[in-house]
């Protein structure tokens, strides 16, 4: 039986093949991305630099002598590599379990291609089992929570966590996310919301799944 970490590593190592040399790339956050950074560092593949979405990813990139640059220093990114908490057959995702989804959306939007890497347990027919992270301004937390409650969700403050931008995270359980694009937009319209963890406008272009049979490359709506 292959462990979850081994499945993540399988996907991460396959993703290195999708990284073009002599280009700037974007790097996400999370345990699967840690395996990807390790694989990229050991591959010998040369890139100009990487824009990191978190301090932890940046530190790991530096360990492998991969140049870390800011998004303001580059005109665009060839590819963005990141994991997901859930990903559906249209390659729309829920992300932000690590609280970095605002930065992740910014970097993803600057990239020509989004490669999602995950173990096979993250591939679902319908989003919503994983709680949806919503980054909120602290002073609007109660207001936003009431609005989310009215939308059918069960909001819960992520205790003791502050985002990179000094905001709070409300994790929303039980939302009906049959229409991810609509839900993403509706939540972002709530005053006091900075960003939510539905990636429908910035869906992945390619999904690389780590499975018992090896790495599986999936494109939108292939099933």
Curated annotation (Swiss-Prot):
Active-site residues per Swiss-Prot or TrEMBL entry: 104
Keyword terms, alphabetized: Isomerase
CDD domains: RPI_A
A GO CC term assigned to this protein in UniProt: cytosol
InterPro entries: NagB/RpiA_transferase-like (IPR037171), Ribose5P_isomerase_typA_subgr (IPR020672), Ribose5P_isomerase_type_A (IPR004788)
Residues engaged in binding substrate: 29-32, 82-85, 95-98, 122
SUPFAM superfamilies: D-ribose-5-phosphate isomerase (RpiA), lid domain, NagB/RpiA/CoA transferase-like
Tagged with keyword Nucleus: no
Gene3D superfamilies in alphabetical order: 3.30.70.260, 3.40.50.1360
UniProt KW Protease keyword: no
Reactions performed catalytically: aldehydo-D-ribose 5-phosphate = D-ribulose 5-phosphate
Pathway stated in the Swiss-Prot or TrEMBL entry: Carbohydrate degradation; pentose phosphate pathway; D-ribose 5-phosphate from D-ribulose 5-phosphate (non-oxidative stage): step 1/1
A GO MF label: ribose-5-phosphate isomerase activity
Function according to Swiss-Prot or TrEMBL: Catalyzes the reversible conversion of ribose-5-phosphate to ribulose 5-phosphate.
Protein name: Ribose-5-phosphate isomerase A
Species assigned in the record: Neisseria meningitidis serogroup B (strain ATCC BAA-335 / MC58)
């Amino acid at each position: 039986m292959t462990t979850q970490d081994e499945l993540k590593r399988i996907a991460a190592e396959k993703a290195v093949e999708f990284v073009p040399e002599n280009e700037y790339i974007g790097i996400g956050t999370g345990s699967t991305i840690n395996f990807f950074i390790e694989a990229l560092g050991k591959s010998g593949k040369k890139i100009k630099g990487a824009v990191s979405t978190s301090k932890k990813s940046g530190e790991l990139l530096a360990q492998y002598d991969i140049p870390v640059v800011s998004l303001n220093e580059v005109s665009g990114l060839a590819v963005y590599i990141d994991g997901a908490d859930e990903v559906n057959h249209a390659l729309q995702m829920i992300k932000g379990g690590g609280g970095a989804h605002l930065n992740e959306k910014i970097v993803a939007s600057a990239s020509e291609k989004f490669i999602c890497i995950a173990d096979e347990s993250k591939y679902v027919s319908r989003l919503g089992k994983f709680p949806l992270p919503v980054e909120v301004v602290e002073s609007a937390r109660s207001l936003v929570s009431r609005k989310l409650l009215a939308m059918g969700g069960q909001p819960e403050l992520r205790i003791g966590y502050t985002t990179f931008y000094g905001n709070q995270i409300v994790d929303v359980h039980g939302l009906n996310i049959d229409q991810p694009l609509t839900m993403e937009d509706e939540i972002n319209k709530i005053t006091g919301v900075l960003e939510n963890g539905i990636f429908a406008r910035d869906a992945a272009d390619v999904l690389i799944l780590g499975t018992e049979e090896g790495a599986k490359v999936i494109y939108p709506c292939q099933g």
